[in-house]
From Swiss-Prot:
Protein's cellular compartments: Cell membrane; Cell surface
Tissue specificity statement from the Swiss-Prot or TrEMBL entry: Highly expressed in skeletal muscle.
Gene Ontology terms: biological process: angiogenesis; atrioventricular node cell development; atrioventricular valve development; BMP signaling pathway; cardiac conduction system development; cardiac right ventricle morphogenesis; cell differentiation; cellular response to BMP stimulus
Residues of the signal peptide: 1-23
Annotated GS domain residues: 204-233
EC number(s) reported in the record: 2.7.11.30
Effect seen on changing residue 58 to Y: In a renal clear cell carcinoma sample; somatic mutation
UniProt gene name: BMPR1A
Post-translational modification: Glycosylated.
Keywords attached to this entry: ATP-binding, Cell membrane, Disease variant, Disulfide bond, Glycoprotein, Kinase, Magnesium, Manganese, Membrane, Metal-binding, Nucleotide-binding, Receptor, Serine/threonine-protein kinase, Signal, Transferase, Transmembrane, Transmembrane helix
Family listed: Belongs to the protein kinase superfamily. TKL Ser/Thr protein kinase family. TGFB receptor subfamily.
Disease named in the record: Juvenile polyposis syndrome: Autosomal dominant gastrointestinal hamartomatous polyposis syndrome in which patients are at risk for developing gastrointestinal cancers. The lesions are typified by a smooth histological appearance, predominant stroma, cystic spaces and lack of a smooth muscle core. Multiple juvenile polyps usually occur in a number of Mendelian disorders. Sometimes, these polyps occur without associated features as in JPS; here, polyps tend to occur in the large bowel and are associated with an increased risk of colon and other gastrointestinal cancers.
The protein's name in its UniProt record: Bone morphogenetic protein receptor type-1A
């Protein structure tokens, strides 16, 4: 009977302990007392060692907001830590609380990190009522990287928007100002044009104006005011060519066709030089391209350099030979007229209104034009050199352009040409003229045979040869364009072959003069009864 009583007592104690353990809620970590039964606070009689927390001393802590049910006078008992905590809720209000913390997990809870969205701070201690004096403070507000980046992006976007708006306003003002200036210039131009129409009488042709200037003027071309008037009244029709200097247009002045050479602004030196040469006294010749006017047109934002000349619809000798063949009479007419033009350039005319000797320096088939009557005229004088015999001075143009490498004389290619004397420039022109005669002779039909058109040295150098390519062929190997065997069987071509060979001789002193070439061709023209 006593044993049964003991078993009942033990069973009751066990059930009491179980009920105490299961009755703890989730917040017992913070406000649980951690109290144990008397039997739990002692070692078992069998000598079994209890857990470490069973040996820790119990603390009395101050509690407020986290008091357990058995708290007395705002105090609680625990074997863990006393704590004080301050929290901020979703509305931004702060709450300060304190209480007891159980031993289990207390180290982790005391090192608790606040959440990113809700701030809180917890402080722990291990002496009686120590948390009564703890005053935890909330951590400072930290701006997250995303929020910080958003601010930067917002500032950047606003700055960009302001800059774009400012640029739009500036561009609009600039365009409006330019538009007003353009309208003003156009009105002024139209007003000047009306005045100019009255300046040149209606019915006057270009030939009439030029004849008048030749008979009553200085022989250097139309007066500048007339030139500017003509340039203003030109109507551009279509582009007919383009080169390294600019473009060539076919235009009309009072119904008459004219050629308008529009120079790039970078080629102002070439425009100035060519204008200067054309306006040289006594320069006009039937085998030199007829000069009409020169002018600079434009406003502050654009500039056009005009050179207005006679228009020849057959184009250049280069274009003509590619699509047409020649008989001996046509060949001699082309060669003789070109020689006449070159002779006029090279010849100095003495007198009070004399003409200086001029060397072309860029003679080639593309710079010789074909007139309606089948004769030639020499064009493109942008590189021309003048010689003043009174001062013995060689006037070389100050521009960056150079001649065409394919047509350069040996002394130009190997840089042995004496630039301080005028005669070497003349002899270099003669070499180039010999190559042009070769181009013509290839297209002359004899015995029903004719060669296709080719440029000089077509089979010896690339299509765009370098100085080294030409120097190797012309100076080192001393080669010249190939000649067909049929030329020797025709009297006319045989004479032309002899002439061109004397033109392209390696030694400049051995070459013919332009006057000698002209006289030789004149005899051939006369023997063939060619009408010039």
């Amino acid at each position: 009977m006593p044993q049964l009583y003991i078993y009942i007592r033990l069973l009751g104690a066990y059930l009491f302990i179980i009920s105490r353990v299961q009755g703890q809620n989730l917040d017992s970590m913070l406000h649980g007392t951690g109290m144990k039964s008397d039997s739990d606070q002692k070692k078992s009689e069998n000598g079994v060692t209890l857990a470490p927390e069973d040996t820790l001393p119990f603390l009395k802590c101050y509690c407020s907001g986290h008091c357990p049910d058995d708290a007395i006078n705002n105090t609680c008992i625990t074997n863990g830590h006393c704590f004080a905590i301050i929290e901020e809720d979703d509305q931004g209000e702060t709450t300060l609380a304190s209480g007891c913390m159980k031993y289990e997990g207390s180290d982790f809870q005391c090192k608790d990190s606040p959440k990113a969205q809700l701030r809180r701070t917890i402080e722990c201690c291990r002496t009686n009522l120590c948390n009564q004096y703890l005053q935890p403070t909330l951590p400072p507000v930290v701006i997250g990287p995303f929020f910080d980046g958003s601010i930067r992006w917002l500032v950047l976007l606003i700055s960009m928007a302001v800059c774009i708006i400012a640029m739009i306003i500036f561009s609009s003002c600039f365009c409006y100002k330019h538009y007003c200036k353009s309208i003003s210039s156009r009105r002024r131009y139209n007003r000047d044009l009306e005045q100019d129409e009255a300046f040149i009488p209606v019915g006057e042709s270009l030939k009439d104006l030029i004849d008048q200037s030749q008979s009553s003027g200085s022989g250097s071309g139309l007066p500048l005011l007339v030139q500017r008037t003509i340039a203003k009244q030109i109507q551009m029709v279509r582009q007919v060519g383009k080169g390294r200097y600019g473009e060539v247009w076919m235009g009309k002045w009072r119904g008459e066709k004219v050629a308008v050479k529009v120079f790039f602004t970078t080629e102002e030196a070439s425009w100035f030089r060519e204008t200067e040469i054309y306006q040289t006294v006594l320069m006009r010749h039937e085998n030199i391209l007829g000069f009409i006017a020169a002018d600079i047109k434009g406003t502050g934002s654009w500039t056009q350099l005009y050179l207005i000349t006679d228009y020849h619809e057959n184009g250049s000798l280069y274009d003509f030979l590619k699509c047409a063949t020649l008989d001996t009479r046509a060949l001699l007419k082309l060669a003789y007229s070109a020689a006449c033009g070159l002779c006029h350039l090279h010849t100095e005319i003495y007198g009070t209104q004399g003409k200086p000797a001029i060397a072309h320096r860029d003679l080639k088939s593309k710079n010789i034009l074909i007139k309606k009557n089948g004769s030639c005229c020499i064009a493109d004088l942008g590189l021309a050199v003048k010689f003043n015999s009174d001062t013995n001075e060689v006037d070389v143009p100050l521009n960056t352009r150079v001649g065409t490498k394919r047509y350069m004389a040996p002394e130009v290619l190997d840089e042995s040409l004496n630039k301080n004397h005028f005669q070497p420039y003349i002899m270099a022109d003669i070499y180039s003229f010999g190559l042009i005669i070769w181009e013509m002779a290839r297209r002359c039909i004899t015995g029903g045979i004719v060669e296709e058109y080719q440029l000089p040295y077509y089979n010896m150098v690339p299509s765009d040869p370098s100085y080294e390519d030409m120097r190797e062929v012309v100076c080192v190997k001393r080669l010249r364009p190939i000649v067909s065997n049929r030329w020797n069987s025709d009297e006319c071509l045989r004479a032309v072959l002899k002439l061109m060979s004397e033109c392209w001789a390696h030694n400049p002193a051995s070459r013919l003069t332009a006057l000698r070439i002209k006289k030789t061709l004149a005899k051939m023209v006369e023997s063939q009864d060619v009408k010039i």
